């Protein structure tokens, strides 16, 4: 490099340093930095979904913190159950959670059964969509809340609609409200490392002859701002004799900005108990050759652990150390660094203690 080129490079470096110094002085330390600096967070922080299969499908071991997440699906598909499981997982690692119940339909007894600590859960039941999003904005800006769930986008009714007459035509009002709110929220969410989960409902587009007629409420803004979008569906029923005791559920990762998308996970949601962790361990264990299956019999490390999935599920509930051992082997097989958390005691077991 000749002297002239060296001098020009030195001048450019000085000018850049002065510009960076001016930006930091005006907007605060950390407003701009080199990606190679240690201050920049290279690894994405995640929280488990409560479903081992879904954690694997997400590619990073859970839902990313400091991002917007959308969970949508038909009625009674398990949207709220999944988000309550995420709240329980966040509380397990010491996080503060808030539930903005715009639908005014949260079943606190059910939430408690899923492992949610109600004493530490912040709950808001706003009157209007604006109020719900202002509360969300205030909680995010506080920097002290780790997870906020909004249930649901469809219930975020603009104030003008509530104060208006039945039958008033107010096109695009909710979409504009969501667009404005997300423009405000996104930067703050990233800075405070708070995860915001929007639960959404499905509507049918009229006159669609070809392609998927389904769409979500609240316009397109949420689709763009979400880092992860999950489509959750009920695909079957779980029966014990003639009685239906749960749902077979499929979740598809429709959008993923932190790992490859379009993967899917299947798991069981048991009524009154949530996602069946043991059921997932059995299915994924067999797929990873950690558990051997011969006919109806299941074996682990050469020892038979039960005949039929229901019996093995009960066996793993009673032998939690074995269940955690199998789960960690599955995680190693899939390259997930995070270890299996201890099983939370059920409501009945807590009552016995």
UniProtKB/Swiss-Prot annotation:
SUPFAM superfamilies: P-loop containing nucleoside triphosphate hydrolases, RecA protein, C-terminal domain. It is found in: Cytoplasm. It comes from the Bacteria. This is Protein RecA. NCBIfam families: tigrfam_recA. PANTHER family: MITOCHONDRIAL DNA REPAIR PROTEIN RECA HOMOLOG-RELATED, RECA. Belongs to the RecA family. GO terms for cellular component: cytosol. Disulfide bonds: none annotated. The gene is recA. Pfam families: RecA, RecA_C. InterPro entries: AAA+_ATPase (IPR003593), DNA_recomb/repair_RecA (IPR013765), DNA_recomb/repair_RecA_CS (IPR020584), P-loop_NTPase (IPR027417), RecA-like_C (IPR049261), RecA-like_N (IPR049428), RecA_ATP-bd (IPR020588), RecA_C_sf (IPR023400). One of its GO terms (molecular function) is single-stranded DNA binding. Keywords: ATP-binding, Cytoplasm, DNA damage, DNA recombination, DNA repair, DNA-binding, Nucleotide-binding, SOS response. ATP binds at residues 73-80. Its main location: cytoplasm. Signal peptide: none annotated. Can catalyze the hydrolysis of ATP in the presence of single-stranded DNA, the ATP-dependent uptake of single-stranded DNA by duplex DNA, and the ATP-dependent hybridization of homologous single-stranded DNAs. It interacts with LexA causing its activation and leading to its autocatalytic cleavage. GO terms for biological process: DNA recombination; DNA repair; SOS response.
